[in-house]
Amino acid sequence: MVVDREGIAPTAADWQRHVLDLEGRPAPAGYDAGPLLALAQRRHAELQRAIDARDWFDPWIYPNDEEESPSEAVLPWVAGFAAAQDLFPALMSMNAPDLVEPLALVYLHFDPEDLEDADALAAVIETIEPPADLAEAVQDLVRAMMLIADVTRPRRVAPQPQRRPGPRKPPRRR
């Protein structure tokens, strides 16, 4: 989950209601959403750990056929990311120039006509070469998430342990 610089992130209760329905409407009567929500929570934790450690994660991308372009294959993932940004706009309201490139790597998969009020983003997208294949498209998405994390939750530099002075050498005898 992407957070802003103050560490504010949607809680599980905030985002879980959108797992079954984008608008957050309740599940139909009699439907037990528990197992699906448990899986979503588990995946969230996996992604959280990977992004926090800046490790590779495998986005769930399912190409439909060999004729499909890389952008068409990743579009459901990108659309989910965009929907999350609409629901939880803290990331998009940050004024951080370092976010433009990673957001462009994600949003370049949309039709340029769909990027309303995103002139700076559209300008950067025009300079990016589209991915040559699905592997490159997936790599760009993961890279974009890591770059976003670098801005929204920078790694804390671990304090260096202080070195203890070693044993003193005895004075030289004459």
Q: Where in this protein do the model-derived segments appear?
A:
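Acidic/negatively charged segments and metal-coordination signatures
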Residues: M1-L75, A82, D86-R174
